[in-house]
Amino acid sequence: MKIKTRFAPSPTGYLHVGGARTALYSWLFARHLGGEFLLRIEDTDLERSTQPAIDAIMDGMNWLNLDWDEGPYFQTKRFDRYNAVIDDMLSKGTAYHCYCSKERLETLREAQMARGEKPRYDGRCRDSHEHHADDEPCVVRFRNPQDGSVVFNDLIRGPIEFSNQELDDLIIRRIDGSPTYNFCVVVDDFDMAITHVIRGEDHINNTPRQINILKALGAPVPAYAHVSMILGDDGKKLSKRHGAVGVMQYRDDGFLPEALLNYLVRLGWSHGDQEIFSVDEMKQLFSFEAVSKSASAFNTEKLLWLNHHYINHLPADYVATHLVLHIEQQGIDTRTGPQLAALVKLLGERCKTLKEIAASCRYFYEDFSEFDADAAKKHLRPVAVLALEAVRANLAALSEWTPATVHAAIEQTAEALQVGMGKVGMPLRVAVTGTGQSPALDVTVHAIGQSRCLARIVKALDFIACRTQESAG
């Protein structure tokens, strides 16, 4: 049997982390077993479905590199197929017209709730022989079995059973003629030969209804796996109030797709105590036997830790391709400084996101108009003039400009002045970067470049002289 899974989001909002994890699990299961993975857009909610949401889903899938073998399919383009199946069910008696008014159904619901009963349709039209005009408004309901039970073996949770007496006759076609979500899903899974349905646990209650419809159609019943929800740090379902965002927001915040994938796969699945997984390892190792039934808590610090790991362990040239977006957002022209791959190596250890790298790299490419006030107050003082003049002379004398020769020049200056390296290094760092923090000074000075560093030291000396004059005045 060829394994075939699907990811079937509704385009009513962005692709959130819960949906992305479901997509990842479905994709990994298919790839692990050499099967196929398809993308289906379940856009039957015409009022809430939007093109921007469809675009966000596609962008998120592409950014995460979750490629699909078929699709994307759109349910709104299959309405003729759904209605043809419904008409066939009506002719076979597995579905029926229901003419009950909204008012009657609301009265029925209120009475059932007043008696402490679960609200459900009472089947009034199920076996009715009343005559109705062809144009009388009605819905179509599925004739659900009234006895027995539905049992399915969830790949994560084990056997789950529902009594058919608990299931009412589901509406499968609305009064406006449009098919309903639960019905469209069944026809799609049948037509598209889906063998494994992997989705969130909020769909468990839909499963027995869908299985009964499949059986009524004479269709094979797929296997099901219902993934537990993701919680916020307060133990409640992850939502916008926890800062939950769409997948593409993680890109915009400077995360690598490898980091988010690694984080999402571990958000419910494990392989021993291993934390770092390449995509190839995920495909090789993934199985539902190792997926937890319990809800998982989203931990941003863990995601940041993984992102820092991937920034520093993936090839710098590759990381640089993802850094471009953030550099452009900062408006930095990188033609007059180190290559972006070199920048990744320079700042990667100090930064947890690509956005942080872009925000802290400007001094490598552009001259700054002001020094950081605290750093200048502490290190650009008259006592630093001698060190800055001496180190400038030694740097200017270098015929070979490498981190090693830069380091030797700084060390030579400190030895000549009989002071510690910090007495030379800190004023020099503030002079050439404008701040009190940077990567190792020798590689920083080297990356900024000889002529630019020499000019910035002069600027720092002028700054000290100006401040000294102001103080004296």
Swiss-Prot record:
It comes from the Bacteria. Keywords: Aminoacyl-tRNA synthetase, ATP-binding, Cytoplasm, Ligase, Metal-binding, Nucleotide-binding, Protein biosynthesis, Zinc. Its cofactor is Zn(2+). GO terms for molecular function: ATP binding; glutamate-tRNA ligase activity; tRNA binding; zinc ion binding. Its EC number is 6.1.1.17. It catalyses: tRNA(Glu) + L-glutamate + ATP = L-glutamyl-tRNA(Glu) + AMP + diphosphate. Zn(2+) binds at residues 98, 100, 125, 127. It is found in: Cytoplasm. The keyword Aminoacyl-tRNA synthetase applies. InterPro entries: aa-tRNA-synth_I_cd-bd, aa-tRNA-synth_I_codon-bd_sub2, aa-tRNA-synth_I_CS, aa_tRNA-synth_I_cd-bd_sf, Glu-tRNA-ligase_bac/mito, Glu/Gln-tRNA-synth, Glu/Gln-tRNA-synth_Ib_cat-dom, GluQ/Sye. Binds 1 zinc ion per subunit. GO terms for cellular component: cytosol. Belongs to the class-I aminoacyl-tRNA synthetase family. Glutamate--tRNA ligase type 1 subfamily. Monomer. Catalyzes the attachment of glutamate to tRNA(Glu) in a two-step reaction: glutamate is first activated by ATP to form Glu-AMP and then transferred to the acceptor end of tRNA(Glu). PANTHER family: GLUTAMATE--TRNA LIGASE, GLUTAMATE--TRNA LIGASE, MITOCHONDRIAL-RELATED. NCBIfam families: gltX_bact (TIGR00464). This is Glutamate--tRNA ligase.
